[in-house]
Amino acid sequence: MSITSLKNQKEFELINKLGKKFHERYFILVIAKNLPKIFLETKYNIFLGIKVSKKLNKKAVVRNKIKRRIRHLIRMNVSDSKLKAIKLAMIIIPRKGFEEINFSHLNDELSNIILKNI
């Protein structure tokens, strides 16, 4: 089980096009299970993209904290779920209020969506 990030705009656009969107109160999650050949030929199982807009918070420190929280949420959900066996790509877009909400609440929401749709 290994996670890597989406590297460029082309990869983000491809996952947005192929993936299914799930709108939650504090974030939008795009999951693509049917990955193109360029993703399947790598050793990584999960491709993660995080988009944190300046509209969410103007301070880079806060935006980076949000990214760290998201990465940790994904690592927690991947380590104790059936995600280890399949290849998929995800894009997470946090919404307003993401930085104030309790971490365990975010973990519950994210794990419910991922486990329902995998």
Swiss-Prot record:
<comment type="similarity">
    <text>Belongs to the RnpA family.</text>
</comment>
<keyword id="KW-0819">tRNA processing</keyword>
<dbReference type="GO" id="GO:0001682">
    <property type="term" value="P:tRNA 5'-leader removal"/>
</dbReference>
<dbReference type="GO" id="GO:0000049">
    <property type="term" value="F:tRNA binding"/>
</dbReference>
<dbReference type="InterPro" id="IPR020568">
    <property type="entry name" value="Ribosomal_Su5_D2-typ_SF"/>
</dbReference>
<keyword id="KW-0540">Nuclease</keyword>
<dbReference type="GO" id="GO:0030677">
    <property type="term" value="C:ribonuclease P complex"/>
</dbReference>
<comment type="function">
    <text>RNaseP catalyzes the removal of the 5'-leader sequence from pre-tRNA to produce the mature 5'-terminus. It can also cleave other RNA substrates such as 4.5S RNA. The protein component plays an auxiliary but essential role in vivo by binding to the 5'-leader sequence and broadening the substrate specificity of the ribozyme.</text>
</comment>
<protein>
    <recommendedName>
        <fullName>Ribonuclease P protein component</fullName>
        <ecNumber>3.1.26.5</ecNumber>
    </recommendedName>
</protein>
<dbReference type="InterPro" id="IPR014721">
    <property type="entry name" value="Ribsml_uS5_D2-typ_fold_subgr"/>
</dbReference>
<dbReference type="Pfam" id="PF00825">
    <property type="entry name" value="Ribonuclease_P"/>
</dbReference>
<dbReference type="InterPro" id="IPR000100">
    <property type="entry name" value="RNase_P"/>
</dbReference>
<dbReference type="GO" id="GO:0042781">
    <property type="term" value="F:3'-tRNA processing endoribonuclease activity"/>
</dbReference>
<keyword id="KW-0255">Endonuclease</keyword>
<keyword id="KW-0694">RNA-binding</keyword>
<dbReference type="InterPro" id="IPR020539">
    <property type="entry name" value="RNase_P_CS"/>
</dbReference>
<keyword id="KW-0378">Hydrolase</keyword>
<dbReference type="GO" id="GO:0004526">
    <property type="term" value="F:ribonuclease P activity"/>
</dbReference>
<comment type="subunit">
    <text>Consists of a catalytic RNA component (M1 or rnpB) and a protein subunit.</text>
</comment>
